[in-house]
């Protein structure tokens, strides 16, 4: 299920509305990414986090040493 483990954002029901004003059911799903997060105690955990939480800086992403060396070069 697409649910953010930080803010609790989850899919919401809504309607598609056509030009002729017909309503059909649909789901609005949050943009949830599976990322590796560095926790406060120093451990790394894979979590489902929405992109608005990532952009707001509510979590710290984990970058391995090999990735950080590649980023510097």
Curated annotation (Swiss-Prot):
Keywords: Ribonucleoprotein, Ribosomal protein. GO terms for molecular function: structural constituent of ribosome. Pfam families: Ribosomal_L28. It comes from the Bacteria. GO terms for biological process: translation. Disulfide bonds: none annotated. One of its GO terms (cellular component) is ribonucleoprotein complex. The keyword Cell cycle does not apply. InterPro entries: Bacterial_rp_bL28, Ribosomal_bL28, Ribosomal_bL28/bL31-like_sf, Ribosomal_bL28_bact-type, Ribosomal_bL28_sf. Belongs to the bacterial ribosomal protein bL28 family. This is Large ribosomal subunit protein bL28.
């Amino acid at each position: 299920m697409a649910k953010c483990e930080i803010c609790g954002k989850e899919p919401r029901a809504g309607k598609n509305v056509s030009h002729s004003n017909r309503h059909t059911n649909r789901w609005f799903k949050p943009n949830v990414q599976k990322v590796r997060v560095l926790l406060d105690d120093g451990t790394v955990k894979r979590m489902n986090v929405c992109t608005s939480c990532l952009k707001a800086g509510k979590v710290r992403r984990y970058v391995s040493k090999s990735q950080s060396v590649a980023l510097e070069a």
